[in-house]
Amino acid sequence: MTTKRRNHGRNKKGRGHVRPIRCTNCGRCAPKDKAIKKFVVRNIVVAAAVRDISDASAYDSYALPKLYHKLHYCVSCAIHSKV
């Protein structure tokens, strides 16, 4: 029978089993190697308020913290949200 992809849509080569993860969007279980991963780095502070906070800060060169978040999507949610 013909196959659609050489890797069968996942990153599992010699492993027999990989643990499932939950989709960030819908909560569906998907294998960890098949899920589409997206690493998001965002500022905690909104861009409009950055200047106000830096002016009000007592420290001169205070770097505002960032928000690091790893998103896992199932295949259908990744296609739907065009990730």
Swiss-Prot record:
GO molecular function terms noted in the UniProt entry: mRNA binding; structural constituent of ribosome
Alphabetical GO biological process terms: translation
Family as reported in the entry's similarity comment: Belongs to the eukaryotic ribosomal protein eS26 family.
Keyword presence, Protein transport: no
UniProt xrefs under Pfam families: Ribosomal_S26e
Nucleus as UniProt keyword: no
Name of the protein this chain belongs to: Small ribosomal subunit protein eS26
UniProt entry keywords in alphabetical sequence: Ribonucleoprotein, Ribosomal protein
Signal peptide (from-to): none
